[in-house]
């Protein structure tokens, strides 16, 4: 089984280079000032210049306005990951304004009822990202996981990715339970919030390659 990978929240040339070297399919940049992983569009542009074309560049946003999306897109992004309370109407507006950009919608999952929102984004988002629900200001990147068994028999309305509490030690179990074909990691390759560890990035990507 071929599982694709996204390393999210990168902010240095060294960690970007490591993610590329070990085969990440997507690299994510956070454009949310309250996050310890936040970068400016200017910083993202500098980092994106070292990423080859075959690696997709995702921007992570929380209820962004179009001005921020435009500035971030100019850095070289290929996709928007929306991690806030964006409604279906708002996503439709973003798609109309940025028709060539891939759109992912993150869903916060704590129980089976939370999956009921997934079909609302059919025809609007290109992909759903299932992440663990958090209680604080930050909508993701907290190292929390939800009960993966919720996805075991679920009929997904869209292509999807798994996130939340993943690391090199549990990724095999996570994929075995959920059947995920795309996995997204942030805090699981950090030594502290916002500080990525190159060894952990390499170990995670190598672990996925062995699946």
From Swiss-Prot:
Family annotation (CDD domains): PRAI
Keyword Amino-acid biosynthesis: yes
Catalysis performed (reactions): N-(5-phospho-beta-D-ribosyl)anthranilate = 1-(2-carboxyphenylamino)-1-deoxy-D-ribulose 5-phosphate
Keyword Lyase: no
Pfam families for this protein: PRAI
InterPro entries associated with the record: Aldolase_TIM (IPR013785), PRAI_dom (IPR001240), RibuloseP-bd_barrel (IPR011060), TrpF_fam (IPR044643)
GO biological process: L-tryptophan biosynthetic process
GO molecular function annotation: phosphoribosylanthranilate isomerase activity
E.C. number: 5.3.1.24
Pathway stated in the Swiss-Prot or TrEMBL entry: Amino-acid biosynthesis; L-tryptophan biosynthesis; L-tryptophan from chorismate: step 3/5
Transmembrane intervals: none
Keywords carried by this UniProt record: Amino-acid biosynthesis, Aromatic amino acid biosynthesis, Isomerase, Tryptophan biosynthesis
Superkingdom, natural source: Bacteria
Gene3D superfamilies: Aldolase class I
Similarity section: Belongs to the TrpF family.
PANTHER family according to UniProt: N-(5'-PHOSPHORIBOSYL)ANTHRANILATE ISOMERASE
Name of the protein described by the UniProt record: N-(5'-phosphoribosyl)anthranilate isomerase
Species for this entry: Zymomonas mobilis subsp. mobilis (strain ATCC 31821 / ZM4 / CP4)
Organism lineage string: Bacteria, Pseudomonadati, Pseudomonadota, Alphaproteobacteria, Sphingomonadales
